[in-house]
């Protein structure tokens, strides 16, 4: 569909609900501006470019969006594709519209930059745009819908990329926002491009049974009208509802069903005036037809995460026909079809309070708030709790994949309470959903009577009885086990609190040690009558600097920890000697310090001794890669790859120190290394991977696999033990010999 569309056609659609002349003039002003800016530009179809923003705005008008959203639709490409500037838009149309257009532009730009694969950064842009102003994404959905409808003018390989992106990202966004009609249209167009054989097969099956199906459903509609309107005198609307092609395919594929086994292809929708009437209608329907057990769903009492509300029941008619009935109010039906967009529907004369509308959506779709919270994690917080584990990209991708792009599962407590979780949730996620304190003490669960560890993935229908222990508490490995953002946040909060407590306790202990050591030194000096040999404080500090101590307190703590004897400490720092004797003592202690580091640490920190050194968990450096040390207030020196993105900012470069691998120690050690494997999914592929790793004696610490929808792309993430970079290359080369594996690469955690 790249047929020409005139502004008058779009205006006619707008005038169905916007009558104010001043508002209509402002919309026309935006159209004239867009037409001027896009003058001379053409689309791949050869059509004038202005056709695209006109169609985008037409869709927005069909959804009854407000005037500012319509104007943003007309202008949504001017910043990206024309010389127009933000300042010019602000001057002509105001800051709100300028911000909307800029928001759409940023999302579009990021999509083009990252189109080769779904990246967490792209997803972040989309969802942060929603959290800031939901209208940005509504405009973007209208934009994408028209681009899909005209996708036939692109090269086949480009069609595939855009169709996959639309199916994996934009249909999921429409679903999350409850925009069912848009979701179905995006899915069906994308599915037709990605899998034309299956698409045409289902179309053929639908067409072959279409007449019979229409007659059958019309018969049931008339039966229900007679029962509800004629006999029960209820004010209702009754009509048929068709299932989308992609949803039929997904149900056939996911549950292994035949076309004839899918009962909700046939469905009747009943619209009532009130919630009370919904339940009255349900009672009348069940009086006249036989309801199927376990096929009743009350989404009015417990709405879906995307705000969807309705009663669903599957019934059997006297003639044996099985069909679904959906019962809802007018408002629920509008929300079911348009979702969040329904909140922004423009009504003439209404107090159109944008801040209030966005606040209402934010409160009801709390996922956006959680994403904003992640965006605002402070540097200090990341320093205090192993910042590498909570990298925004990694956690963002988890949240979006687990909380938004997934189906839901329904799990039962032992007393029959239903708990809703994202698909892929574990026992640990379930425990935290029940209560934070239960989550913190969880050691496992009985699933359907059998004991299972906290990492066990749950499925719908499981009866889960959580087992706890008083001594149990969260640890960093739980961040890998947990799949839901809410559980991750609670674990993170606990670990932060624990770290603060441990650090506080350690400081108190250290202060007491320093105090005691200082008293012991003073007693020793007094007992030996050495006060006359004491040097001044300035000389003491010079001597401390010579052996890499910044202050007397750090040195006294080392003495307290038996790194030096009292006599060594006093002779070295406090007493005056002949120059030759001072140099001799200094040399002896420096040698001792260096040997101690040689024996203990696999990382040598140049110019600093007796300090805690840890391998950073974000980049997991391995011998003998180029590394650098980052001075962390809470954890000493953290060793990163020099190329690690987490230490590239200017403020972090100021806190870096030179470090090197201690070959004498690290040659006998194994180090964690994270890799990602991209492959075409097939039976026994995981078995082949584990066989190769086993043959190479590679110790696997963690492995997860994920198939992306119907596209059969398998991603395996694993952490293995390696001795050095050469060993990693050997493992990588061996994995690449496995058929259907396309990529094996080192990844950040």
Curated annotation (Swiss-Prot):
UniProt EC number: 3.1.7.2
Domain (ACT) ranges: 674-749
GO cellular component, one term: plasma membrane
Molecular function terms from GO: guanosine-3',5'-bis(diphosphate) 3'-diphosphatase activity
The TGS domain, residue ranges: 407-468
Residues forming coiled coils: none
Family stated for the protein in its record: Belongs to the RelA/SpoT family.
Annotated function: In eubacteria ppGpp (guanosine 3'-diphosphate 5'-diphosphate) is a mediator of the stringent response that coordinates a variety of cellular activities in response to changes in nutritional abundance. This enzyme catalyzes the degradation of ppGpp into GDP. It may also be capable of catalyzing the synthesis of ppGpp.
Name of the protein this chain belongs to: Guanosine-3',5'-bis(diphosphate) 3'-pyrophosphohydrolase
